[in-house]
């Protein structure tokens, strides 16, 4: 079998940087899927992505599609011929569709009789004849939310397409993709290298593009180069570069030929909280800040240019000039904000609507203050500090800094509170109230901050559910899913003794008559338990384990987590499968019971297996009670796992539905007690 390397490059206008990597990997995945569907073998697929191009290279692609045989089964022989042995219309129609006569058909014997069959051979096509459609289909399936048209084209893509190059080895694959004919011409860097040049062989990519076009097409190569050079620049300046993965990938998507440079800003700006300076450097300018070994911001930053002049002075000075006004604004806002205390901004919260039916931000602040105090009492935090932090929780939204740099909310509240002389725990809580901000983010460190964070999240959840605006589909304008998961993480990971129903009831009471949904408590609790499912599935915990616990609907998150861990452990035991099956059988038997089931009567036991199980469950009922009270569900299930032998013996030797009513009721009582022991932890009958 002969093979060749295949290259396809789509040359475009500047692609959206935050979507570039996803587009490139999806393009490669789609090409791979199309090749597999076509039956074409290959060794490896490589993807390339730069601001003005997407490319895929297939290594050792078979140049010929294999032939294949397909079996077309026709009617049964009994239905294919009439009483005189002549073909029926059904048989003739089938044969005609296969391009044969009925006489040419073969026969195949099965356990359901004899059937007409035709084995047809489909010759494989040369790969080059298939590639245009393969690429077109792969591009059509890209995740493009808002495709665009350009010039007089009728086709749509994420950005205008200027060049298409498809090469199988050295052979140009002719065809048209997105309204552009395939050609050997590819474009180089917009400012460096050759503007256009021809590529003769797929093997020349991406090296030729770098040599002639001054473009590093390999996304990961550019990324690694930017990271290494940025770290080296920071080290030379006596610091460490703050390089977040998301920003690194965005910067990588903005440049074709990275030139990493360092610049500086005036030291006077360091009097402004570092978070505000970093916000504008990262968010607006896509710069990497530099910190010293103690975590203090240095008056330097790193940026990545898309051009590489011999003397970079002009570029460096240009970037310093661009960032200076933004830092000056931050300095002005900070100094202006310090003239008014946070607490004095409370009245202005009355002018800002939180939600039309739920009132203003001042209303929300009042509710957070009260609920944070209640939570603080339950978790052993300082109630007064929690209430004070709740009262001030949204005041920084009224500052100039947060109005201009929205992502600094919370952290600026902390800085302003410190300036105002507020207690340190209160100040820190103003920042940590929003934690966790995203998946994997850190949690509030103090119990005071945890109380405020939980109060804020439960207020939002209860309020929005209370007016019937639960999330639908992917729409979640109030970020309720994030709020629910964040609250669960705080309670579980800090092992807080809190109950969801209790918290929602207390939160709902603070809304007076604003809530219209009478089922708000159950709705919020069910929603949050549903988030548990997503959380544990992300951790790799089996769905049936989660369902086993959900069946009991425990509403204390820390308790819920302990049950999940216990059932997950139980599932690994040798006796788990048999006991799960036995519990399922017990559930079915008890569901058919036609009378109330009483307590076990040991003296009424007749069979040895019956008495053995009765004694075992009664002993275990006593032994597991203190463990249940301690929440040590793993130990409970470890003990109950010892019931496998007496349970198996019971079902092998005892007839539950005995004719004697007293005997039958006692055996049902044994099974009811057995089931009850497991249900104190979870419904293990749902385990698969």
Swiss-Prot record:
GO terms for molecular function: arginine-tRNA ligase activity; ATP binding; glycine-tRNA ligase activity. Its EC number is 6.1.1.14. The keyword Ligase applies. GO terms for cellular component: cytosol. GO terms for biological process: arginyl-tRNA aminoacylation; glycyl-tRNA aminoacylation. SUPFAM superfamilies: HD-domain/PDEase-like (SSF109604). SMART domains: DALR_1. Keywords: Aminoacyl-tRNA synthetase, ATP-binding, Cytoplasm, Ligase, Nucleotide-binding, Protein biosynthesis. It is an enzyme of class 6 (ligase). The keyword Cytoplasm applies. It catalyses: tRNA(Gly) + glycine + ATP = glycyl-tRNA(Gly) + AMP + diphosphate. It is found in: Cytoplasm. It comes from the Bacteria. Pfam families: DALR_1 (PF05746), tRNA_synt_2f (PF02092). Belongs to the class-II aminoacyl-tRNA synthetase family. HAMAP family: Gly_tRNA_synth_beta. PANTHER family: GLYCINE--TRNA LIGASE, CHLOROPLASTIC_MITOCHONDRIAL 2 (PTHR30075:SF2), GLYCYL-TRNA SYNTHETASE (PTHR30075). This is Glycine--tRNA ligase beta subunit. It comes from Haemophilus influenzae (strain PittEE).
